[in-house]
Amino acid sequence: MTIQNIHDLFLKCSKVSIDTRKIETNSFFVAIKGDRFDANTFAKEALEKGASFVVIDNANYYVDERTILVNDSLETLQELAKFHRQFLSLPIIALTGSNGKTTTKELINVVLSKKFNTKATVGNLNNHIGVPLTLLSFTKETQIGIVEMGANHQKEIEFLCEIAQPDYGYITNFGKAHLEGFGGVEGVIKGKSEMYTYLKSNNKFVFVNLDDKIQSQKSVTFKRITFSQNDKSATVFIENVMANPFVKIKTLGVEINSHLIGLYNANNINAAITIGHHFEVPVSDIKAAIESYVPENNRSQLLTKGTNEIILDAYNANPSSMVVALENFIQLDKTNKSVIIGDMYELGEESLVEHKAIVNFLKNNSDFECHFVGKDFFANSIQKENFHFYHTFEDFIKFLSSVKLEHKTLLIKGSRGMALERTLEYL
């Protein structure tokens, strides 16, 4: 069966699924092998739950004529997504970067949806499985697709671009994320820049923050749409940016008051403004869209718990995002501040060095209480008044049980694996 034949069957279905727990009537189920399971074994169950067709790559689990047997289910999912993207032929905006991908994607989506029927990556489904699923969620009614791409190794962005074939691209930044897989910061720059390489070779467009030296230099010869706080020749000149704690931006003749905390979110907003402007979304609609966006999922959320005001930024962390979050917190005009920060994952052999750098940064720049949670921070323990180190989250909770934190402004930030949002239960 050709990929076109498979696509014809897919078009008869309402949606694609890889999880029998979420099967809906008339789904198109693709059995993907995972680390702990083989979804081929769920093919019969998928059909019983209402799937119209199932794709498998193990003949032992063939059910009936509704079963599509292929050599590799994952490769078929990816090829199907690529074929579907070409079939729809709609403009696609791709974005990647070390920090801020998901927030920027959501901002772009709310802005463009003021004028267009848009579809965007759900959550952070941004890998070799998530990107195909995103593309397969697009329909003939979709006018613009927004695809987030994540990577922790070389060649991943290149591969995802070959599937999604974006017409526009934006890289949020190049930072110290996934150093273990990329082999250092230079590896991060090389890996993320694979998007630039694809766009350049296919004569496509890039959105560029001219104030980011790496972005600016790498895109000089590209077809680019730009923004800047310093260069008035940029496509969109950002006149003024403030944050205390929420970001306010003046540009295109309006002042935009966001619900996003910290100057580190300013460029996420600026990118969405620039992309909206390029697609001729009225400035009043751009302003309304950004002002209506409220972050969730532990991303720069401002919460109140008891007597404490909390900046919850516990979805993820790396050295770059940790420093900018701490810099912003230090500058906040608040009294009785305290930070609760957790280990940063996937840093490889640089992990202890990077955790030590964060400890030293706070040692030199803070005069408030600091709680460090996790084995790599614990390995860099120092003696300093108001500094507290905990080997595990459970050790930290024991402390919280004995000393109540009250009337404080708190920053909570750590890698996803630390799940520091659990702290809220004990405040």
Specify the residue positions occupied by each region the protein language model found.
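Residue-level signal for inorganic ion chemistry
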Residues: S27, A46, L80, L95, ...
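Acidic, Mg2+-coordinating active-site environments of NTP-dependent enzymes
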Residues: D57-D64, Y170-E309, K334-T335, V359-E369, ...
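Active-site beta-alpha connecting loops in nucleotide-dependent enzymes
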Residues: I32-F37, P295-N298, A314-N386, S415
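Peripheral docking tails and interdomain loops at the edges
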Residues: K408-E425
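N-terminal leader/targeting and accessory segments in enzymes
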Residues: M1-E79, F83, I330-T335, N360-G374, ...
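Phosphate-binding loop of NTP-binding sites
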Residues: V63, T76-V206, L210, I214-K223, ...
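ATP-dependent carboxylate/acyl-activation modules
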Residues: L95, N297-R299, G417, E421-R422
